[in-house]
Amino acid sequence: MNYPFRRILIDFILGHSDAKLAQRLVLSLYENYPLENFYAMMNLVGSHDEVRIMTILGEAQINEFMPDTEIADYQLPLEQYKLAMQRLKLLATWQMTFPGVPSIYYGDEVGMQGYKDPHNRGSFIWGNEDKKLLEWYKQIIAVRNANPALRTGSFKILQAEDDIFIYSRVINQGIDVFGQPAENGIFIVIFNRSKSEKYELTLEVPEISVGIMEDVLTSCQYSVSFGQVNLIVEPLSVIILQDVTPQYQKKAGILMHPTSLPSAYGQGTVGRAAYEFIDFLEKAGQSLWQILPLNIPDNVGSPYQSVSAFAGNVNLLDFEELITSQL
């Protein structure tokens, strides 16, 4: 059970530590665990041994002289509950996009509250579930399940400053961090823990994306220009950017000089054999062509030299074709 992970996240979200300290602590975890362990850690934010995560994130205060009956019945005021829910959305998203195995303590996904044992182990609140919070969990779980890069992709912290924490999850060239075949995917996860301040960010992403990135939570798209993407991160919000730049399929073609075509005279010509070869390429589904001029287009227009590569080359003439064509 990855309690250090839990402590790092809660301290950062509550403002007990800044992003720089959170970065150092996350990297300490990353460096001290073997890769296989780091990617298999049980990443939790709620537990049967701790105060309910909603109660913590709502900053509920407990008085040591408070009667146990009041502790048992305590519920966050509405504004504190709303704050706790927004914060929990951030933590849950962090769980689902971070290396490791996310663990959800029953009831956290529907907003259950409670102080320490036994108040954190109450019956499930059937009929009183927070449906909006539950839908958020369903959404981010679906995002994780649909994208291998969020499970076995590489992990790199891109920025950690003040209220902002950003990392990437990437699978390139069809191979994940364990050297296993996996679907390519590029993601950038951006957190703003501030309760009031929005941030205008310019992210340097030259090695991550060269085209278009899309927030998988809102479908809002961002263009990458000169290796940078500009965006605004609202208070208590998260953005999950996915690279959606169109991927061009690899294609093959044939680059060949006409003289390389077979001929009874030992050298190919621009004649019947060339026409038949072009017909063959078309029937074979070839779609890449290189067209070279047979006359001089201009002083510097040839793809090979300052004068046409073919113009005036009588060796390319097919005399049988000339006779057949009565030329």
Task: Show which residues each predicted segment covers.
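Carbohydrate-binding surface patches
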Residues: Q159-P206
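Short, solvent-exposed turn/loop segments enriched in Gly/Ser/Thr/Pro and often Arg
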Residues: Y106-G114, K156-I157, Q290-V300
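Conserved, mostly hydrophobic/aromatic
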Residues: H48, Q95, G107-E109, I140, ...
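Alpha-amylase-like alpha-glycosidases and glucanotransferases acting on alpha-linked glucans and related
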Residues: M1-P99, A160-D162, H257, V300-L327
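C-terminal beta-strand-rich structural cap/linker in extracellular carbohydrate-active enzymes
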Residues: V224-K250
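Acidic/aromatic-lined carbohydrate-recognition and catalytic surfaces
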Residues: L236, Q249-L327
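Solvent-exposed beta-hairpin/edge-strand motifs
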Residues: V205-S219
